[in-house]
Amino acid sequence: EENDDKEEKEDKAIRKDDGMEYIGDLLVGYSYADEWANPNAFLKDWRVGCPDGGKNNGPQLWNIAVLNPKTLFNEDGSLGTSGKLLKNKIERTLDGVENIRVDNVMGLVDPYIYKSSAVQEDGSISYNDRNFLSYTGIDPQHNYPKIFHKILIPTLKEHHINPQNVVFEDLGAQSPTFQEVFYGGKVDGKVYEDEKMQGIMYSKGNKMEGIKGPRYSFLSTHDNEPTATLLEEGSWIYNNEGWNPMYLAGYLMPPYNKENAKKSAEFCKDIEDNPRTRLKAKYAELFRGTPNIQVSFADLFGIDKTYNIGGQSNKDNWKLKLNSNYEDTYHKSLETEDKPAMNMPELLEIAVNSKVGMSIAKHEKTESEAKAETADLTERLEHWKDVLKEPEPDTFQDYEDD
């Protein structure tokens, strides 16, 4: 364990020099061993689930223990048994990483819970035995909503992590209590002005131009279909404003003069005719819309298979993996464009040039000034996008899915 700690610190030092950050997963759940070792930290009978996606159109029953609200904090405000357990869990997750993704943040504010003893043989459960914790009456002191601002946020700051940079995943169903705490920064009437979160922008069908607020955006995750499947003939993207060729071309290649107007028109036609170009443009638009984007491994490698069908018990869930020759496969995909793998330098170059073009179109800078500011960056991006397309040894294999 001592060697592991030393290695983690050395890895962090190397990444710091390279400007690279790792994001660890903070899973809001506990093991049976945690329950056995800390009986007072958890509620009896109650378990964490999800309001939708279960059997017979009911909730998902995850069988995850629920922290006891009564032992989160002592009377003097210090951490109680379950509060200490949670803080230690967050601390362990932060060891060796520079940021975290909270899965799911609802579980740290207002989890959806159910009585395990009330679950029927067919998996169904009465509405009276399941709800968001805030509606059950088992937390009269409102301790659970305090977790976010009194345990999670302070712990992040102790590790020099800006809460606004954390990736938060919700369940797609947000309770009023959650919205007050997360977006309003409210706990028992007090407003934490500097800790209001902005969340993630699920941008699959949205325009990113002029978007304000979200720190992260994404097209797909491990819980839904990869973007490669969106390119199929008849897909909804071909009739969606967020994927409209004229919008994407105008936003990414502003026609600020005759020469650029011609290039923008050609780009627009390519987006219209070529599904791969349309996806490439949509990815570049994400880089223009928010400071950060979230990318699933399936999208990065252009895989058209779904990693996990969210809300379903599927025998193939979580089994998709890369082949042992994935680096060659990736380079081959970029070289031949037979799979919509993401060429990051190329996408960033489009986004940077878009920003340059927009500043010129708005008369914020002259063309020579705007291009001079990014000349070094665009030159390097131009170089590396081509390097990634260079031929690799002929060892191409399909992605494995079992």
Protein language model features and the residues they cover:
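Structured C-terminal cap/extension of enzyme domains
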Residues: 302-379, 384-390
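Conserved, well-ordered alpha-helix/loop/beta-strand core segments that scaffold catalytic motifs
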Residues: 8-27
